[in-house]
Amino acid sequence: MKENQKLLLLCGDSYQNISLLAAVKEAQKLNVKDGNVLVLYLGEENTITQEAGEQVVVSKLKLDALRTTLLSYTGSRLLLAFADKQILNLLFRLEETGFFKDASIRIIGPSLQRYRTFYQQADQRRLFQELGYQVPASALVGSVREAIEFSEGIQFPIMIWPVASKQGQGRKIAHNLDDLCEAVETGLSVSPSQQCLLEFSTYGFKELDFVVMRDREDNHYLAASIESIDPVGIHSSDSYQFMPAVTLTDREFQNLREAAIHISRYLKLTGAISIKFALDPTSYAFYILEVNPFASDSISLASMGLGYSLFEQGVQLQLGRSLEHLPHPLLKDLKAVYEPSLDYIFFKIPIFSDAAKNARLNTQIHSYGAVYGFGKRIDEAYQQALETIKDKNLLTILPEEMSDDELIQKIARHMPHRLFYILEALKRGFEFEELLDLSKLAPVYLQVLANLVEMEKVAEAENKPAFLPVEPSAGLYEVKVGAAYYLTQNGTNESLGLDAACVLVDDLEICDEYFYQKVRKQVKELKEKGQQVILLTNRPFTESLADKVYYLPINETSLHLIQTIDQVKDIIKLSDRQ
């Protein structure tokens, strides 16, 4: 391959830099075998691009800038797994001029023509209808007047989607005509095509994400089902979420699974694909909200919950590898096509800054990160994530100091930390039915919180702490070396002790963008000295870094539990607070 002929991972701006961080990590791995992989980031220079050095090429998100940059890499290949709709818009325009043919640049994975079929939400809706799926009534508008005309034939609330806006900027739910006019005016200003998709809102429906992995030969599996506790109308990044989805009936689950696979197959998408659904809680009816074949927070969450990177596997599939030939990342003697069957719950709690604590949650992102927990049950996984919040002093509110009236207002208004307010109300003896009416939570979710209150009353002497591996076969297959373990309060321990091991404590900040590089560097240095390394961390990694990993809150209790299993000769704390 000539010097200027590269594999370019096109990457756009994203929430918490998920796309950029994942692209840089995959480029580093691919370059171990082939030094001709670069990340082409369309956005502004930032600390991540600077830290990555020559690994990342930065270009403005402009047509001329992208054309000029690509001309430096004639004969190269483009991979779009980390791109977004704004990048697609530029690529479509370049394709129309014959640029890619003239520059001998080839797009690998799904073709641009394939992406065109669902580039706009309106196109997606038509496609879903052709496939026999329900879609909300909708219209593509280019002016406020057109929006008003559409609203006259439909009931509020109405969802406004600016077409191809950056990170979903401008999305809003309008509850009346004034809301609609304001939202459409804003949406038109942030849409590259000056268009907005208006649709009947599924506000209040149950929101779910299904992640499908598929290769060119149509081998596929359902990697994850993610359930949001907050309903449609609150951005999934701000919602409490868990996987796998366990409150669905078998019929509901199978309907959504079949739809996710059917759509991925029909569109001939490869790699990791996230499909977002709205499920009517009063019937089996569901709506398809979005199909996303790019890096997303859903795929990131699924990767952390499974213990291996779906980004990495997705890149391999887009490069032409087969699920039947790729080895499974975690399980011995298995191929990657294996469909996960989890016997644990992985839970996400969003975290908010002090400035956002009084915001009213909606379709815009207000959180700046998240903490996670594992457990045998939803309440146990939630409790573990909650301990991390307490240990890190991330909670910017004090529900116990609020009056009953204040709690009621916070619960009813869909504000950040809402579950903390509900927990406090349960402790004060609020009636279950009263909280159902206030919060509009599904009864099953409120029962989880009620269980938590009861858990706090159980004497510690009744608990039998045990470590179980994070793996996708529910204990059916043996895990590879370097497995990660989570803690459950009742079970049989499966973590075999290590002798004379060093415990590396990941006490870095929750939103430290370089945590992966820092931890990997420290583990490598310790291993080069011949040490066995145990990693204690409260953030799930998607690959094996140490000889063993424990996902636990960072505190003395966790260290004590590890020392009951492993012979620890040294403890090293990796922290930003030296």
Segments and roles (model prediction):
Residues 140-143, 271:
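Short, glycine-/polar-rich solvent-exposed loops and beta-turns at beta-strand/coil boundaries
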Residues 143-154, 195:
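Conserved phosphate-binding catalytic cores of ATP/NTP-utilizing and phosphoryl-transfer enzymes
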Residues 471, 489-492:
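Low-complexity, acidic/Ser/Thr- and charged residue-rich accessory regions of DNA metabolism proteins
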Residues 83, 143, 554:
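Flexible loop residues that form catalytic
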Residues 465-482:
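Long, low-complexity segments enriched in small/aliphatic residues
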Residues 76-84, 429-433, 475-479:
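N-terminal-biased segments
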Residues 2-65, 69-74, 97, 131-132, ...:
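ATP-dependent carboxylate activation and anion-phosphoryl transfer catalytic cores
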